[in-house]
Amino acid sequence: MEPQKLLIIGFLLCSLTCLLLETVASSPLPLSALGIQEKTGSKPRSGGNHRSWLNNFRDYLWQLIKSALPPAAIVAFLLTSALMGILCCFTILVVDPVH
């Protein structure tokens, strides 16, 4: 396989791994970080750590996944995904298709 394709695949796998590790390491946030007001009628604080809607959506999805799946299943999925990525890279590196 061409070195350029290997470099692209390696970059994508590295980016995906970093994204997954960041997601796992992120701590759960209170509802005020999502912009949800409490029943007392107070407005959410717009402090210096303003978050984009994409980060809020990511945090919402992470909370949904954490509440629906046990932690062991999440860890097993991440380890399996990393193992499959490594095996895919080894397959690409070792097996060179014959033309």
From Swiss-Prot:
Q: Where in the cell is it found?
A: Cell membrane
Keyword Protein biosynthesis, does the record have it?
Answer: no
Q: What is its main location?
A: membrane
Q: Provide one Gene Ontology cellular component.
A: plasma membrane
Q: Where are the transmembrane segments?
A: 74-94
Keywords tagged on the record = Cell membrane, Membrane, Signal, Transmembrane, Transmembrane helix
Q: Tell whether Nuclease is among the UniProt keywords.
A: no
Tell me which parts of the chain lie in the Cytoplasmic compartment.
Answer: 95-99
Disulfide bridge positions per record: none
Q: Which residues form the signal peptide?
A: 1-26
Ranges of the Extracellular topological domain: 27-73
Protein's membrane topology:
Single-pass type I membrane protein
What is the name attached to this protein's record? Small integral membrane protein 9
What's the encoding gene here? SMIM9
